[in-house]
Amino acid sequence: MKLTCVLIITVLFLTASQLITADYSGDKRQYRAVRLRDEMRNFKGARDCGEQGQGCYTRPCCPGLHCAAGATGGGSCQP
């Protein structure tokens, strides 16, 4: 009987500790995912932007420029 009580208390304790730590680890994973997403957006190849007169079909124009549609369907970065 004593062994059964000890086992039940142990299982309850372990279950409670897992539930408590699961809440904290979920937040860390969420923040880690956000950090990784931001790193992927800011890697060197993603920061490349089109200068004036360059095409803007596959990459965005640099700040201060906008993509103007051309006659051939593609656009170029213009002020």
UniProtKB/Swiss-Prot annotation:
Q: Which organism is it from?
A: Conus virgo
Tissue expression from the record: Expressed by the venom duct.
Signal peptide interval:
1-22
InterPro entries for this protein: Conotoxin (IPR004214)
Which family is this protein grouped under? Belongs to the conotoxin O1 superfamily.
Q: What is this protein called?
A: Conotoxin Vi6.4
The record's Gene Ontology cellular component field reads: extracellular region
Q: Which residues carry this modification: 4-hydroxyproline?
A: P60, P63
Task: Relate the protein's function as given in its record.
Answer: Ion channel inhibitor that inhibits the increase in intracellular calcium upon depolarization in DRG neurons. In vivo, both intraperitoneal and intracranial injections into mice induce hyperactivity.
- What GO molecular-function term can you cite, just one? toxin activity
Notes on the domains:
The presence of a 'disulfide through disulfide knot' structurally defines this protein as a knottin.
Q: Which UniProt keywords apply?
A: Disulfide bond, Hydroxylation, Ion channel impairing toxin, Knottin, Secreted, Signal, Toxin
